[in-house]
Amino acid sequence: RLRAEKKLARTIHFSFGYAEGGGIHKQYTLEDPTNLERDIFKVINYFANRLCDKKALYRTLSVSLTQFIKESNRQLNLFIDEYERKKDVKLAKTIDHLHLKYGKGIVSKATSYTEAGTKHGRLGLMAGHKM
């Protein structure tokens, strides 16, 4: 939705809720605002690996984004590969367009087609239930 609104997010809020109650809450402010899932998941994965109990059972995961800016106001960052970033943004926008035109299941990562992949079995479900 961020890309559709032509916005970038600076702050990522996320929480992991334990099945037995309690959990971990964290927020992280990016130096370079983003609207790419890869950048957001990289931050969450980093903190999940450092903070989460790998033996605990988790019931909830919550992710939210704040501190939005317009894409057109993004400043050039000399410390990242701008060519690579533009390529990633173009790919993400193309995938967004295909999802709008043909539906969510039209483009998937290769891992979705492996035995461990769950995406195709969950298409058409809302919170794990048939709609």
Residue ranges and their predicted role:
Residues 1-131:
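Basic, low-complexity intrinsically disordered segments
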